[in-house]
């Protein structure tokens, strides 16, 4: 997802209204949270107001969401993890705010603006396709179905994967080998279930 954005959306409002908090960032993307913690320390916040704890969800996350001193949990992540957090929170009626996986769709009619198809595809690819609010499918008017396929094929094949620190018109890799393998599994499943692959494919998400 968007590590610094997600962290700030949760941390800043909580601190602004006088709450104390514990932040556990994703174990795959902790650096933004560490930088923020250093800034908060430089700003001389009282000790204990903001607390950073690193670790994975299965151990650290489980311990935090089960702890009796935690009154509210705000979580952005997978539906599976959200269900586990809800179970922990229910034991002592913690308040919970969950932002979980979505299944957004693009809907494009014949009279849509000329760049609607490409813009919809861009929203899928943005952040290397790792945004929880990225569209997952496109529904197009039947009369322009073939045109939409060709335009999407051309647009998708123009994308290149390269070093995210370099400037240029490319996207970075996904965050981990585990995520890459998950994508490969989903591509294969789609093909096995009858999907017509027109861009990318096995080994090249």
Predicted features, each with a name:
Residues 1-116:
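Rossmann-like NAD(P) dinucleotide-binding subdomain of oxidoreductase/dehydrogenase enzymes
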Residues 72, 78-205:
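ALDH superfamily catalytic-core signature
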